[in-house]
C-alpha cells in the first residue's frame, strides 16, 4: 500500500500538475477588468496575454461588466468575493 502511494506521488512530481480555471481576471486590489462591448476583442486580448485560452466581455455578470477568461492559469489573480479596493 505504501509503495502505491509513493509511486503515485512520484508520478505527480515527474509529470507536473497544471490546472486552469474559468473566472473573472482581477486587477490589483480585487477589481475586474471592466468592459462595455460584448463584441470587442479587448477581453480576449487581456485574457490571452495572461495565459488563458480565450476571453470575452460578460455583460451584467456577478461583478458587473467584466472580462471572463477561459482556462486561466493558477498563477494569475482572479476576482474573489469581497470588495474591490481601488
UniProtKB/Swiss-Prot annotation:
It holds the Pfam family Toxin_3. GO terms for cellular component: extracellular region. One of its GO terms (biological process) is defense response. Disulfide bonds join 31-84, 35-57, 43-67, 47-69. Residues 86 form a propeptide. Its main location: secreted. SUPFAM superfamilies: Scorpion toxin-like. The keyword Signal applies. InterPro entries: LCN-type_CS_alpha_beta_dom (IPR044062), Scorpion_toxin-like (IPR003614), Scorpion_toxin-like_sf (IPR036574), Scorpion_toxinL (IPR018218), Scorpion_toxinL/defensin (IPR002061). Residues 1-19 form the signal peptide. Residues 21-85 form the LCN-type CS-alpha/beta domain. Alpha toxins bind voltage-independently at site-3 of sodium channels (Nav) and inhibit the inactivation of the activated channels, thereby blocking neuronal transmission. This toxin inhibits inactivation of Nav1.6/SCN8A (EC(50)=790 nM) and drosophila DmNav1 (EC(50)=280 nM). The toxin (1 uM) does not significantly shift the midpoint of activation at the two channels, but induces a significant depolarizing shift in the V(1/2) of inactivation of the channels. Has antimicrobial activity. Belongs to the long (4 C-C) scorpion toxin superfamily. Sodium channel inhibitor family. Alpha subfamily. Has the structural arrangement of an alpha-helix connected to antiparallel beta-sheets by disulfide bonds (CS-alpha/beta). This is Sodium channel neurotoxin MeuNaTxalpha-5. It comes from Mesobuthus eupeus (Lesser Asian scorpion).
